[in-house]
Each structure stands twice: as C-alpha cells, then as structure tokens.
A protein has these predicted regions:
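Exported/extracytosolic protein signature
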Residues: 1-255
Length: 255
C-alpha cells in the first residue's frame, strides 16, 4: 500500500523463473482517491522465452577389459536431455580410433550411420526428459605383442543453446591383449642311406593377428629305439614372429 503525491513515481522490481514458453506480466493499480484516467491503471509486458536444453552424453563399453585381438564388443552411447526445452537438431559424433573396426551402428531414437570409423547419430528434436541411444559394434585388433589400450570419446551437439556444455562428451577405454597362432612343420627326406648326413628343415609360422614374442622351437631327432645324436651348435632357437611371418631353419644329423 502506497501514498503517491502529485507527479510522483515509484518503481518496484520483481523476479521469477522463466518458463519454457513466453511469459506475460500484467500490473494493476487502484486507489481510494478518485482517478480521472482509469484507462492507464493496467499495464502488460511480454517476455519471449529463449529455449535452452541441457544435453549430456555417456559412453559405456560392454567389455572394458579381457579382450583379445579379433574379438568383438560394443559401445553404448546414451544422450539425455535434462531440459527445460526441447533440443533441436541433435547430433552425436564419434570417431572410433584405429585398431577398433566398426562392424555395425544402430540407433534407438536416433538415425544412425557411419563412414568407416566416423560414426554419427541424428534426431531432429529430443524432448525435455527424453533419452536416445547409439550402439556401435566393433572388432578389435592388436598386431603387437603387448596389451594395448584404446580411448574412445563421443560428443553431442544441438542448435538449441546448452547451459552446461561441460557434460557434452563421454569417454570409454578398452584394453586389447595380443593373440597369436604359432605353428610348426618339420620335413625330412622320404628315404636316406644309413651312415650318411641328412639335412632336414623346420618352419615356424605365426598365423595369428598379433606378434608372437619369445617363440621357442626345438627339434628332437630319434628312432623307435632312442634319440640320434645330431651335429651342430644346438636345436633350440628363440624367435619373434610378426603376423603372417614364417621362418625356416635347417638341421643335420647322421642317419
């Protein structure tokens, strides 16, 4: 309740939390004194709502550890709109690192696709409180002989302003152990004369997708009655075999 002298103006302030839609405020004034211009006793003002949407993204690996080369696993990317407005033109982007090969991409609430390891998901609008998911299935490689770690980050953007952009990325890390497949083949002449020196060969191969480290091969030459003594400096060799590599060695013995 106020008392206003002739020509006096008093200004008051008020606050409110902006709604998702436009807001209209109406002020009225009355007095017990006769008012000769009652048409200006009501004033209206409008405020347009600028949409904002707090998007966040998280990324989870189905199997962060215990993977081996050539195995498969999946990443789940979850986008949440905490509002308060609908997020327009939402795009999820993920560049899967080399060493992980994208096999398939699918979306729940998102249109999904990929160009090689460049994965994306889009939706024209994501309502406040809504969730959308992008799933990426990958195969894993490791051509070395040590366990590797891969870090993969997904991000989300929208044409609607985001008041909290710090939660617009999500990261998952996975490890991949090497997996080799070593094999050996030994050959001898089909026939040899007793007392002669015979040459044989032994090959060591790696048919796996990872490097085989500290490969030890040996050849024991013998008959049904026992081992024959061979000549040379030894019959054991330590090797490193890269994927697809074959090494062939020779050995001799007296028949």
């Amino acid at each position: 309740t106020l008392t206003l002298t002739p020509g006096q103006t008093i200004t008051l302030t008020f606050t409110f939390t902006m709604a998702v839609s436009d807001v209209t405020a109406t002020a009225t004034v009355t007095t017990t004194t006769a008012d000769n211009t009652p048409t200006n006793n009501v004033s209206t003002a409008a405020s347009s709502a600028n949409a904002v949407a707090d998007l966040s993204v998280s990324k989870v690996a189905s199997q962060p550890n215990g993977n081996t080369a050539s195995s498969t696993m999946s990443f789940a990317i979850v986008v949440v709109n905490a509002g308060p407005s609908t997020a327009a033109n939402v795009t999820v982007s993920d560049v899967v690192p080399a060493g992980l090969n994208v096999l398939s991409v699918s979306g729940n609430g998102l249109g999904a696709g990929n160009a090689g390891n460049n994965v994306s998901g889009t939706i024209s609008s994501l309502a406040s409180g809504a969730t959308a998911t992008l799933t990426i299935v990958v195969s894993m490689s490791n051509t070395g002989s040590a366990t590797l770690g891969y870090t993969n980050t997904a991000s989300v953007t929208s044409t609607t302003p985001d008041p909290t952009p710090t939660n617009n990325t999500g990261t998952a890390t996975v490890t991949v152990a090497p997996l080799a497949d070593v094999a050996t083949v030994v050959t001898l002449p089909a026939n040899a004369t007793a007392g002669t020196v015979v040459t044989g060969t032994v090959s060591y191969s790696n048919n796996g997708t990872s490097t085989a480290a500290n490969v030890t091969g040996s050849v024991v030459v013998g008959t049904a009655g026992g081992v024959i003594t061979t000549s040379g400096t030894g019959n054991t060799n330590t090797l490193t075999l890269t994927p697809g590599q074959t090494i062939t060695l020779t050995f001799t013995f007296t028949m």
